[in-house]
Amino acid sequence: MQGVLNRIDRLPFFLQTLFTSRYNFIRRKKSPLGGLYFLKNTFERKLLPRLERVNELCGMNETASIGFLSERDQYARLPDMNDKELRKFAARIASQLWSKYEELSDAWAEAYGGKETLFTDEAQSHLYGQVAGIARAFNITPMFWKKYRKGQMTIRMAFSAISRLIKDEWWVNQLKAQRMRWREALLIAAGEVNKDRSPYASKIAIRDVHARRLANLEYLKSCELENKITGERIDLISKVMGSISNPEIRRMELMNTIAGIERYATSVGDVGMFITLTTPSKYHPTRQVGKGESKTVQLNHGWNETAFTPKDGQRYLCRIWSLMRTAFKDNDLEVYGMRVVEPHHDGTPHWHMMLFCKPGQRKAINEIMRRYALKEDGHEKGAAKQRFESRHLNQGGAAGYIAKYIAKNIDGYALDGQLDNDTGKPLKDTAAAVTAWASTWRIPQFKPIGLPTMGAYRELRKLPRGVSIACEFDDRVEAARAAADEGDFERYIIAQGGANMPRDAQAVRVARKVTDEVNEYEEDIERVVGIYAPHLGTDRVHVTRTAEWRIVPKVLAVEPLTLKSGSAAPRSPVNNCGKLTGGEVTVMAPSPSEHAAAVLDLVDIGAIRLDDPEVVMVLKAALKQDALSPKRLQKSG
């Protein structure tokens, strides 16, 4: 028994706590013999092999490189690292890669006749291959790795990729993402993610995602957007809440899009299908036994060897969908619609797709999809029923059919009283867990299929209401603008040329421009500036984004210090609670990590760009301020 307890002690702290508390509970509430049974049978025989397999797959990739064997034990501690330890580890990796790059550069210059020989595609491709190859030990795919393997590397590509590999902050972001997924993979292996414990995502993941969002919200409240030219300021939080970053607006846009797709399909005589695709059983860490209310969750031993994560399940579904699309193309078949990705109770993803096609093509499309859905392990029990399901959609019923899945995966809107088929729990309560799952594994939940670009639709909606642009372009472009202006997605599809129209043949596309600035990796910055019509030429651009904005801290109105109150005025002007106050409003000073996380959320709405030098300067200033504040507090104390 002591040997098993010692094994528990070697696990990350969050798992130590989990298993130790469970052992003590069983021992206290049942019997010492029950506690011993838990240790020997449940933990050592069933759970420990799963945990060890996850650690083996997530640990250092010695097959890719043995250049970092000295850091193997430290890397194995990643799930248990705090932020301070992680930053030190990231800095050490970046420093070693920089030293390796310098060493290889000197060797190349000496062998081929001086430092000027380094500035060629051949030289930098060689150096990149060595440095990036070593970095792959940490389970990352360096930028442009596929280009390098194909012999298509250029000096500019090499500089961009290497400049990331030798930067501390880049490694901090990579390691934080890995830490989050590694922890969740261990909790899945431990049986903590299922309908009986915590459906869709672990309690730790749900808590962490919720905490990050609260931190982001505090940051957004503490900042404003400032016009670079006029100095005009607007609330950052109001800008975000008026964009698709707001779950309510995102849901409404999706529902409007789906309703428009269905109306378009009806107008052209197409028929609808509701498709469900799932993964083979080996991707599921658990299985359900029994029926109805007596159904229970058991560990799936077929998962133990592969230890697939939800990300692996998503890759599988993307791979078979790619094969299906190729088969459609080879057989002159076309589909269009919307895809929704959601998790099973144990975190394994599955797809729901609302697809439309010509009536005469539906049978062939279903046969192709079924064939590829059952290609891997199609012989296993239940595969024919579970892996692929296709239902005919009644005219006018598609939007209502898929609305539940959209609300469940965003904000739980209008789901009061409805129960989740997977967990038996209220659907309204599952939205937080599902969004935490998507955030943890970075799985996009919604994707249009075969539709005109959504980017152009959103840019057209930025134009002044009711103002024609026909004189600037032509009637095709004006028809697209008018449709977007009214939120009529059916007319927008028609104006763009219909479903499955190649982008270059669409009436309107997003216009981008390379600015005079470069980012921190010395790369050109490309910004969305407006729209253009491919059939009229790329030089005719209508600008939709006339102003440039930057994030700035709010100006806080600080009340003058008086000595009229009964309490003594503080000796130090520093608020030792770490808060800034303005009148009766208290604003939390955001931490550097909060700044960085919120900036990532703002990239999607087009208000700022992460690679904007102004943004980088703001974040660096915040980092510096946070680093200095403890020292100031100590002095003032």
Residue ranges with predicted function:
Residues 1-347, 359-637:
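Right-hand nucleic-acid polymerase module
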Residues 354-358:
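Short hydrophobic/aromatic beta-strand micro-patches
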